[in-house]
C-alpha cells in the first residue's frame, strides 16, 4: 500500500523557498573572515562561488538548494559581489555533482559546532515535538512549517523534502491512532454495542444513524417533537459525559464531517477503534446541532404565532372598520342631540330617542363595547388563540433541554422550572408563588389578573422572554453550540491577561483606558472645533446646519459623458463565450480548482476536473445537480453527488474564491478601480420556493415573505471576496465577518455599508479592530452628535448635538471586558457575528453592551463630522456601494434557473448555492477584466487615444456578451493553449472617434 501523501506538489515547492526580503537576504549572505578564508582555499572561481552559496544556505535557512534547481538569484548575486566574482558561474558549479558532495562534507565538518545533521534520533525528537500539534490538525503544510521552525531553533540541517514528508506521515499516523484511542478509551462494551446498533437498517428503512442526522423539515411542533426524540435517543446511548472534550475541536469536527458524508455500510467497514471514534464524533456534533435546531424551531414557531396574531388583529380591524365608522357617526348624532337639548333645555332622554330608538341605543352601546376590546387593537391579546400549538411540544422541550442562567436571568430560570414542574404534575393553575419579576410591562395586565396568574399568557410570556435571554447569553443550554455561556466564547481570562502583559492583543487601540480616552477625547474636541468653525462660516461643502437640523445636498453625477460610448466600444470587442468556457479559461489562468481537495485527504483532487466545474456551475446558476446532469452530456447525478459530497465544502469554496480575488488584484486594469484597501457589503434577498420555504426566514428589510439572504463583501476592484447566508437578523451583524475571515490577500482598511449595516456596536468593534467604517446613513438628519461637555461650546452644531452626554465612566468600568471581547474576535476564538447577535440581545443595563455603545457613539460622532466636512468621503462611499449594487445585478442575472428561487431546505446546501454564485461572479469579473485589458491594448495599437479617466469608470460586471443558459457542454476543440486568448471581435472605431 503506497504511503499517504502529506504535502501536495505545490506545498513541497513552497516549503523550502527563500523570501524576496532584502533584510533576510542580506543577513543570510553575511560572511565573516574565517568563512572567507575557507572559501578562498578553493582555487576555481566557480567552486568558490558554489561553496559560499552552500555555506550561506546551511547557516541561514538550514537547507541546501535542490541540485535540480538554481538557488535564489538574490543569494547568488550578493555572494558573488562579496567575493568579487561573476554570478553566472553557478551553472558551471552545479554541473559537477562530485564536487558538490565533497564541498558539503567539508561544510558539515566546518559547521559541526553550529549545526547538527538530521539523524534518526533527531527525527524521533522531532516526532515527539510535533505530536501535540498533529493532535490538533492533520494539515500537512502547517505541520511542516512547525517542523522546520523546530529544526531551525535547534540548529539542525533540514533534510530533503522526501524525508520531511516521511516524518510528517509518521507523525500524522501516530496522532490519528492517539485520537482514536482517546475517543474510545472510556467506552464500555454496552456503549460499543449501542453505537453499532446505529448502523443497522431494517429493510428499506434508513439506519438509526441516518435518522438521527435528518434535517428538521417544516416549521411545526411535530418536527420539534421528532428532534426531541432524536436527542432522547442520543441520551439513551449513555455515552460518558465529556467523552469528546479530550480531543481538539478541529479533529472532532473533521472526523464528524467525514463520518456524516459516509453511508452506514461504509462506516461499518472501518476498524473497530476508528469506527467507534468516528461515531462518537458524529453523535457529539449531532447532539449540539439538534439542540440548536430545537431552539431555532421553537423561536420560529413563536415568531409565526406572533405574526399570525398581528395578521388576525389587522384583519378583524379591517372587517369591523365600516361598523366602527357607522358607530362613530351614530355617536356624533347622539352627541349633537344632547348638546342641542342642553342649549334648549329639553329632556336629554327624549332628545336621544328622537334620533335613535332607546333599544337600538342600548344595542349600539353593547356593540361598541365589543368593538372596543383590546383584542381588536392589540395583537398580544390574541396570542393565546394558538396555545395548543405551543402546548404540543413545550413540555417535552423544557424537559429535554438543560437551561442554566446568570444571576440577571435567575427569575426567568425559576419561571421555566415552575412551568416544567406544572407540566410534570399536570397542574392546571399557576402557583401564586410563581416568579413574576421578569414580566415586561406590556404583558403584565394580561398575565397578572384579579383572579390570579393567567396560565396561557404566563407560558407565552416565559417562552417569549426565554428567546431573548438565549440570544443574549443570560440563559444558556448545556450541549448547545450557539447558546453557550457568554464567557465560554471568549479567550480565558488568564490567557488574555498574559497577552495583554506581553503587548500581544493585536488590537488597533491603546490598552490603557486613560491613554485611549484622552487621545479620543482630544481628537473629538479638535474635530468638533474645526467643523463648528466651518459651520459658522458656511464653509461646509454642500452641507447646511441650521436650527432645523442638517441638510446635505445630494452628490452630482461625476461620471464623464464619454464613458458610455467608450464602454460600448470596449464591450463590443469582447468575445461571446459560454459560461462553461469562461470557467475553464479562468481555471487555466489561476488553477482555482486545485483548492477543491478531498475531505479525507487534502492532496487528492477530482480525477475529472470538468465534473468539478459542472458541480460548481450547478450551484452558481441555481440549476441543481439533477437538472445539471440532464443538461450536461457525460455527467450523471451520482457522479455530481460524489463530487459534491467529497470536494465541495465552505472552506474549499473560500480558498478557490481567494485565488480569483488575488488574481484580480494582480491585473493592471484593477489598479484603475482601486488599490484593494476599501470595500463595501450588502445583503441580497432571494425568494424561496418548494421545500425551501421551510428553511427561508422573514427579514423585514425585504418584506413579509420568507427568503434567503446572501450577504456579500466586494472590494474596490469589483471582486467579491466573501459571501455568507444570513438569517433574519440585521445586516450589521455580519459586516465584520467578511473583513476578518476572508482568505484573500486584500488588506482592507476602510469599509462601506448602507443604513442596515451600521449600529453603534459595529462602529465600536470596527474601530477596536482597526477598520475605518463609513456607512451611508439614510436618516442622518435624525442622528445626533455625542460630546463630552457642554453643547454651548459649539454654537454652529448645537442643533445636532444630543442632549445626552457621553458616559465615559461606562467605558472605564468595563474597559477590560471590551478588550477581551475584541481580542477574542481578532484571534478567531469566536466569530464577530455571533458576538454581535449576543450584544444586540443584551438588556440595556448590561455593562459591556453599554461600554461598547459609548465607544460606538464616539466613533459615529467622529464619522458624522468627517461626513459633514469631507465630500470626498461621501463620494467614496457612494462609489463603493454602487459597485456592490452592480455586482448584485450580475448575481441576479447569473442565478437564473428555478425562477431565481432557492429551493434547498438545508442551510448547508443553501450555503453551497451562495458560494457557487459568488465564485461564478468572481470568475466572470476576472474574465471580463482580462479581456477589457486586451481590448484597450488593441485600441491603443490602432491609434485610438485612451483617456485613463474613462478607463477608471469601466466596470467588469457586464454579462450581456455571456451565454448563461442552454446545454452546458465542455468542448475539447475550443480549449485554449497556455498563454493563448480568444480573438477580440471587430468593431467600427470610426464611429467612436466621431462621437468622442
Where are these regions (language model features)?
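Long, compositionally biased intrinsically disordered regions
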Residues: 801-996
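Glycine- and acidic
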Residues: 35-36, 568, 605-614, 621-627, ...
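Short, charged amphipathic recognition helices of the HTH superfamily
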Residues: 50-51, 69-73, 620-631, 637
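Structured, charged N-terminal subsegments at the starts of enzyme catalytic cores
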Residues: 526-631
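Catalytic or ion-translocation cores adjacent to nucleophile or general acid/base/metal-coordination motifs
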Residues: 89, 630-671, 698-816
Amino acid at each position: 500500500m503506497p504511503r499517504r501523501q502529506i504535502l501536495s506538489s505545490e506545498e513541497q515547492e513552497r516549503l523550502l523557498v527563500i523570501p524576496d526580503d532584502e533584510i533576510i537576504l542580506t543577513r543570510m549572505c553575511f560572511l565573516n573572515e574565517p568563512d572567507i578564508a575557507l572559501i578562498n582555499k578553493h582555487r576555481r572561481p566557480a567552486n568558490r562561488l558554489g561553496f559560499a552559496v552552500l555555506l550561506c544556505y546551511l547557516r541561514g535557512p538550514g537547507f541546501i538548494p535542490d541540485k535540480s534547481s538554481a538557488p535564489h538569484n538574490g543569494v547568488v548575486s550578493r555572494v558573488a559581489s562579496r567575493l568579487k566574482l561573476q554570478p553566472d558561474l553557478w551553472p558551471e558549479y552545479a554541473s559537477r555533482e562530485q564536487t558538490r558532495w565533497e564541498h558539503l562534507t567539508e561544510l558539515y565538518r566546518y559547521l559541526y559546532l553550529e549545526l547538527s545533521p538530521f539523524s534518526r534520533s533527531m527525527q524521533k525528537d522531532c516526532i515527539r515535538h510535533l505530536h501535540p500539534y498533529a493532535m490538533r490538525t492533520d494539515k500537512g503544510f502547517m505541520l511542516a512549517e512547525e517542523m522546520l521552525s523546530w529544526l531551525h531553533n535547534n540548529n539542525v540541517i533540514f533534510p530533503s523534502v522526501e524525508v520531511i514528508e516521511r516524518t510528517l506521515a509518521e507523525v500524522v499516523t501516530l496522532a490519528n491512532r492517539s485520537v482514536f484511542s482517546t475517543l474510545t478509551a472510556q467506552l464500555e462494551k454496552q456503549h460499543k454495542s449501542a453505537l453499532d446498533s446505529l448502523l443497522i437498517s431494517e429493510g428499506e428503512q434508513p439506519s438509526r444513524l441516518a435518522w438521527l442526522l435528518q434535517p428538521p423539515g417544516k416549521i411545526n411542533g411535530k418536527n420539534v417533537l421528532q428532534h426531541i426524540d432524536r436527542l432522547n435517543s442520543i441520551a439513551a446511548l449513555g455515552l460518558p459525559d465529556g467523552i469528546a472534550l479530550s480531543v481538539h475541536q478541529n479533529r472532532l469536527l473533521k472526523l464528524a464531517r467525514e463520518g456524516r458524508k459516509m453511508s452506514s455500510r461504509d462506516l461499518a467497514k472501518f476498524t473497530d477503534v476508528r469506527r467507534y471514534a468516528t461515531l462518537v464524533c458524529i453523535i457529539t456534533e449531532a447532539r449540539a446541532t439538534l439542540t440548536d435546531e430545537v431552539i431555532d424551531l421553537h423561536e420560529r414557531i413563536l415568531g409565526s404565532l406572533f405574526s399570525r396574531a398581528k395578521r388576525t388583529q389587522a384583519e378583524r380591524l379591517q372587517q369591523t372598520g365600516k361598523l366602527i365608522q357607522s358607530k362613530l357617526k351614530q355617536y356624533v348624532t347622539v352627541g349633537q342631540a344632547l348638546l342641542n337639548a342642553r342649549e334648549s333645555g329639553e329632556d336629554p332622554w327624549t332628545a336621544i330617542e328622537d334620533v335613535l330608538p332607546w333599544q337600538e341605543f342600548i344595542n349600539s352601546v353593547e356593540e361598541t363595547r365589543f368593538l372596543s376590546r383590546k383584542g381588536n387593537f392589540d395583537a398580544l391579546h390574541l396570542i393565546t388563540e394558538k396555545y395548543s400549538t405551543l402546548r404540543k411540544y413545550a413540555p417535552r422541550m423544557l424537559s429535554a433541554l438543560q437551561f442554566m442562567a446568570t444571576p440577571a436571568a435567575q427569575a426567568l430560570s425559576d419561571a421555566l422550572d415552575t412551568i416544567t414542574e406544572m407540566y410534570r404534575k399536570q397542574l392546571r393553575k399557576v402557583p401564586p408563588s410563581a416568579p413574576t419579576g421578569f414580566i415586561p410591562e406590556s404583558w403584565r395586565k394580561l398575565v397578572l389578573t384579579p383572579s390570579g396568574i393567567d396560565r396561557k399568557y404566563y407560558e407565552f410570556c416565559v417562552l417569549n422572554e426565554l428567546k431573548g435571554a438565549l440570544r443574549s447569553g443570560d440563559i444558556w443550554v448545556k450541549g448547545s453550540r450557539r447558546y453557550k455561556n457568554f464567557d465560554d466564547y471568549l479567550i480565558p481570562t488568564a490567557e488574555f491577561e498574559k497577552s495583554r502583559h506581553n503587548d500581544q492583543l493585536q488590537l488597533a487601540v491603546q490598552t490603557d483606558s486613560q491613554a485611549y480616552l484622552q487621545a479620543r477625547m482630544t481628537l473629538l474636541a479638535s474635530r468638533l472645533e474645526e467643523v463648528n468653525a466651518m459651520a459658522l462660516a458656511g464653509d461646509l461643502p454642500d452641507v447646511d446646519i441650521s436650527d432645523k437640523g442638517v441638510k446635505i445636498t445630494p452628490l452630482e453625477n461625476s461620471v464623464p459623458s464619454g464613458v458610455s460610448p467608450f464602454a460600448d466600444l470596449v464591450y463590443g470587442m469582447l468575445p461571446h463565450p459560454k459560461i462553461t468556457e469562461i470557467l475553464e479559461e479562468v481555471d487555466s489562468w489561476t488553477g482555482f480548482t486545485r483548492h477543491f481537495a478531498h475531505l479525507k485527504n487534502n492532496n487528492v483532487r477530482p480525477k475529472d476536473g470538468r465534473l468539478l466545474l459542472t458541480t460548481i456551475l450547478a450551484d452558481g446558476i441555481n440549476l441543481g445537480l439533477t437538472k445539471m446532469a440532464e443538461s450536461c452530456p457525460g455527467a450523471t447525478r451520482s457522479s455530481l453527488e460524489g463530487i459534491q459530497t467529497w470536494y465541495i465544502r465552505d472552506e474549499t469554496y473560500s480558498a478557490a474564491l481567494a485565488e480569483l480575488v488575488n488574481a484580480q488584484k494582480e491585473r493592471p486594469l484593477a489598479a484603475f478601480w482601486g488599490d484593494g484597501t476599501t470595500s463595501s457589503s450588502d445583503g441580497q434577498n432571494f425568494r424561496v420556493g418548494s421545500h425551501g420555504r421551510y428553511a427561508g426566514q422573514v427579514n423585514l428589510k425585504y418584506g413579509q415573505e420568507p427568503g434567503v439572504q446572501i450577504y456579500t463583501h466586494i472590494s474596490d476592484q469589483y471582486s467579491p471576496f466573501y459571501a455568507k447566508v444570513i438569517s433574519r437578523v440585521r445586516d450589521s451583524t455580519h459586516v465584520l465577518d467578511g473583513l476578518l475571515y476572508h482568505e484573500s490577500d486584500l488588506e482592507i482598511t476602510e469599509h462601506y455599508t448602507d443604513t442596515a449595516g451600521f449600529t453603534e456596536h459595529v462602529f465600536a468593534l470596527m474601530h477596536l479592530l482597526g477598520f475605518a467604517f463609513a456607512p451611508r446613513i439614510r436618516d442622518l438628519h435624525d442622528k445626533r452628535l455625542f460630546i463630552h461637555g457642554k453643547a454651548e461650546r459649539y454654537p454652529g452644531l448645537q442643533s445636532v448635538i444630543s442632549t445626552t452626554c457621553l458616559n465615559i465612566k461606562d467605558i472605564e468600568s468595563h474597559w477590560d471586558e471590551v478588550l477581551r471581547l475584541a481580542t477574542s474576535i481578532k484571534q478567531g476564538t469566536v466569530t464577530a457575528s455571533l458576538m454581535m447577535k449576543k450584544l444586540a440581545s443584551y438588556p440595556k443595563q448590561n455593562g459591556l453592551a453599554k461600554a461598547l455603545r459609548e465607544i460606538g457613539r464616539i466613533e459615529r460622532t467622529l464619522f458624522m463630522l468627517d461626513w459633514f466636512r469631507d465630500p470626498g468621503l461621501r463620494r467614496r462611499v457612494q462609489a463603493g456601494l454602487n459597485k456592490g449594487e452592480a455586482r448584485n445585478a450580475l448575481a441576479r442575472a447569473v442565478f437564473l434557473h428555478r425562477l431565481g428561487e432557492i429551493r434547498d431546505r438545508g442551510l448547508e446546501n443553501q450555503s453551497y448555492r451562495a458560494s457557487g454564485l459568488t465564485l461564478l461572479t468572481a470568475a466572470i469579473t476576472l474574465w471580463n477584466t482580462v479581456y477589457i485589458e486586451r481590448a484597450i491594448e488593441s485600441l491603443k495599437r490602432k491609434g485610438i487615444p485612451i483617456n485613463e479617466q474613462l478607463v477608471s469608470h469601466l466596470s467588469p460586471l457586464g454579462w450581456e456578451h455571456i451565454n448563461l443558459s442552454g446545454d452546458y457542454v465542455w468542448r475539447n476543440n475550443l480549449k485554449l493553449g497556455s498563454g493563448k486568448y480568444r480573438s477580440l471581435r471587430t468593431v467600427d472605431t470610426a464611429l467612436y472617434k466621431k462621437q468622442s
